[in-house]
């Protein structure tokens, strides 16, 4: 390294091609960043990790009152519906490069209104999986609602009553290009109804 700063190179010949790159972590024999001037990269062996997660630390919880478009960098976070109406738009998974990205959603606001999770591409992207619904104004009777590939559903709506109210939690995981898996438990009042559409 001739002028690069704050780099960590561990292993024989690790980072030996770096000249001006800053803030890189390179581990392993002959491992190098993507270029001699790359910044902010983590390379273990010959694999570059653009988003590293340190296990054992807390993940962020974000309360939201407005429409929000998520990115792959938000993966692992918990998002809380903290208002009558808000829409979370998932990142577009059409390129197939965000497999494994996941988000947790919790409804905290208990008023009627449209709280929604939706795919970025409503034509090509689909939600598959199921949720269990618990009717909170009877004996906690349960019902299940499934979303199959053939259904071509692309959004989940919590309406504050029959399709989800405060206490509902859903996890959405990208499993392939244009495919998101959904699992969770929703609380409802009245006659349980599917949150998928």
Where are these regions (language model features)?
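Glycine- and small/polar-enriched repetitive beta-structure motifs of secreted/surface proteins
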Residues: 1-57
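The right-handed parallel beta-helix/beta-solenoid scaffold, focusing on the short coil/turn
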Residues: 6, 23, 40, 50, ...
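Short beta-strand-initiation
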Residues: 37-39, 65, 98-100, 165-167
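Extracellular disulfide-bonded cysteine-rich modules/repeats
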Residues: 40-43, 166-174
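Exposed extracellular interaction/assembly regions and N-terminal maturation sites
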Residues: 56-144, 148, 173-197
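Structured beta-strand segments within beta-sheet-rich domains
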Residues: 142-168
């Amino acid at each position: 390294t001739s002028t690069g700063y704050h780099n960590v190179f561990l292993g024989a010949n690790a980072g030996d091609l770096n000249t001006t790159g800053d803030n890189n972590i390179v581990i392993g024999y002959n491992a190098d960043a993507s270029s001699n001037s790359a910044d902010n990269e983590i390379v273990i062996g010959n694999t570059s990790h653009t988003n590293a997660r340190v296990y054992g630390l807390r993940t962020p919880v974000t309360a939201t009152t407005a429409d929000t478009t998520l990115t792959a960098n938000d993966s692992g976070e918990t998002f809380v519906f903290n208002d009558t109406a808000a829409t979370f738009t998932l990142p577009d998974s059409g390129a197939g490069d965000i497999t494994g990205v996941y988000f947790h959603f919790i409804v905290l606001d208990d008023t009627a209104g449209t709280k929604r999770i939706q795919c970025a591409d409503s034509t090509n992207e689909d939600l598959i999986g199921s949720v269990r619904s618990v009717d909170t104004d009877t004996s906690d009777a349960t019902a299940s609602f499934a979303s199959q590939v053939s259904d071509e559903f692309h959004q989940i709506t919590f309406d504050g009553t029959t399709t989800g109210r405060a206490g509902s939690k859903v996890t959405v995981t990208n499993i392939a290009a244009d495919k998101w898996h959904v699992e969770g438990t929703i609380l409802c009042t009245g006659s349980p109804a599917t949150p998928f559409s």
